[in-house]
Amino acid sequence: MAIDENKQKALAAALGQIEKQFGKGSIMRLGEDRSMDVETISTGSLSLDIALGAGGLPMGRIVEIYGPESSGKTTLALQVIAAAQREGKTCAFIDAEHALDPIYAKKLGVDIDNLLCSQPDTGEQALEICDALTRSGAVDVIIVDSVAALTPKAEIEGEIGDSHMGLAARMMSQAMRKLAGNLKNANTLLIFINQIRMKIGVMFGNPETTTGGNALKFYASVRLDIRRIGAVKDGDVVVGSETRVKVVKNKIAAPFKQAEFQILYGEGININGELVDLGVKHKLIEKAGAWYSYNGDKIGQGKANASNYLKENPAIAAELDKKLREMLLNGGNGEQPVAAATAEFADGADETNEEF
């Protein structure tokens, strides 16, 4: 429908005034010739990249990873750092829990010599460091481990047993308002790792909730619920964890998908095992009995041997990874390897108390 000529002139004058006052690009039509595609960074897991729909975690946004203890939260975050560093990006790790193991990080592929690390004394200090790094425009990925460890200054200076109702929630709410715009302008990915608590007196529904108030839930573009669902064994020895990640919230693609992969102790996400599973599912790898073949050549008997073959031949693994991403991410018609969750699947941390 055509706009009245007088209105058109008034709108043009208003837009001109806004751009003059706030800068070019401060307001524009949504359909203008400007790429709306979101730049992403791989999570280190092919199946999780596919479940996210865009091929990874979005730059310029806030992401929350939460789950029970020893479920793989920090491992997943470190894998994101390793993937970002391989692309030449600068990363920072805000270690509020004072528990980062540099030896383990190095095993996961993190370049610890070029990783910025801070162990702040208070929650306010941690969030101010995040804001300063973001405003510099020079840092691409920031990890905060964890929200539960971001202790307000008043609580640290007070006595144990003192009541500090809602302090952490207010601190996080203020930080989200301040950080969201700066992250977008700097195109910086900020990942918050969070812990789970139990709500008291919940008779029906999920009693689980996350710490730090409700603000993080609203500002996060992606929320990932990570759980350990089993053990990976080599004979009788446990060598890793079977892990499931649910995409609880997703603003860049369809939510409620999930991915399953293995986290091997001392190695991280078993990407080669994922390549074998997805390759078989999408008929890029042939499976006859226990034997696996790629392009007519046998690559191993059993999944473990096939995975080892890909590990020893990174060029073939990269070729297979590229084919799967083209098939499943770039508008391909391949069947999605990750099924949408059922209608009963609910956000595992739907309502958050303000103080824990």
From Swiss-Prot:
Keywords: ATP-binding, Cytoplasm, DNA damage, DNA recombination, DNA repair, DNA-binding, Nucleotide-binding, SOS response. GO terms for biological process: DNA recombination; DNA repair; SOS response. Coiled coil: none annotated. One of its GO terms (cellular component) is cytosol. One of its GO terms (molecular function) is single-stranded DNA binding. Its main location: cytoplasm. ATP binds at G67, P68, E69, S70, S71, G72, K73, T74. It is found in: Cytoplasm. The keyword DNA-binding applies. InterPro entries: AAA+_ATPase, DNA_recomb/repair_RecA, DNA_recomb/repair_RecA_CS, P-loop_NTPase, RecA-like_C, RecA-like_N, RecA_ATP-bd, RecA_C_sf. The keyword DNA damage applies. Can catalyze the hydrolysis of ATP in the presence of single-stranded DNA, the ATP-dependent uptake of single-stranded DNA by duplex DNA, and the ATP-dependent hybridization of homologous single-stranded DNAs. It interacts with LexA causing its activation and leading to its autocatalytic cleavage. Belongs to the RecA family. This is Protein RecA. It comes from Yersinia pestis (strain Pestoides F). The gene is recA.
